[in-house]
Amino acid sequence: MTPPASPGVLYIVSAPSGAGKTSLVKALLKSDPAIRLSVSHTTRAPRPGESDGRDYHFVARDTFEKMLADGEFLEHAEVYGNFYGTSRGRIGQELDAGRDLLLEIDWQGAEQVKRHFPQSTSIFILPPTFSALRTRLTGRGQDSPEIIERRLAAAAHDVAHAEAFDYIIVNDDFDHALQDLVAITRSIRLEAQRQLKRHAALFGEFRRI
């Protein structure tokens, strides 16, 4: 008889806009195929290089509002006038089957998910300095000066909630920050209770001696 799978890990990664969260998450997923990205729904327009179903499920506002009214979202939030939400979908089923999932959401969403999945692992990404964040946002060339100022003000509010997370990574060097992110995922997998379930047959051999 096949032993029950060890439950998957739900990782929550949050950061202020411009901290490098998306790039770090993409690099992590590339280095560790065992972790799957849970794709969120959003009403905002796709950015250059983004595609529907890979980066986000891009939907119209009325579609999002209907899904929200039908209770289809595990968490949702409004950011800069756009809505974001994580579909309940198969998250529970995926975790029960032993698959690791990653949610790339803001602190408000992280708070909601933690209430439903208290065993999830939350990670907050910090920029090295406030001025570095301003430089990154300006360098993207995507927003007007007014929008950048709004993002910087929101960043200060986001960072005020960092203490609620399990881990905090300062992205002052991309490679080092990625190493820190990978180290967290590896350490979670090596927790004793997870290893006991994952290698139940091995421990069983020694108990029979």
Curated annotation (Swiss-Prot):
Keywords, sorted A to Z: ATP-binding, Cytoplasm, Kinase, Nucleotide-binding, Transferase
| Sequence similarity | Belongs to the guanylate kinase family.
Q: Provide GO CC annotations from the record.
A: cytosol
Q: What is this protein called?
A: Guanylate kinase
Q: Where is the Guanylate kinase-like domain?
A: 8-186
Per the entry, what this protein does is: Essential for recycling GMP and indirectly, cGMP.
Where is ATP annotated to bind? Answer: 15-22
Molecular-function annotations in GO: ATP binding; guanylate kinase activity
Pfam families according to UniProt:
Guanylate_kin (PF00625)
Give the reactions, separated by semicolons, that this protein catalyses.
Answer: GMP + ATP = GDP + ADP
Q: What gene is this protein a product of?
A: gmk
Q: Which InterPro entries match?
A: GK/Ca_channel_bsu, Guanylate_kin-like_dom, Guanylate_kinase, Guanylate_kinase_CS, P-loop_NTPase
Look up the EC number in the record and give it.
Answer: 2.7.4.8
Tell where it localizes: Cytoplasm
Report the superkingdom from the record: Bacteria
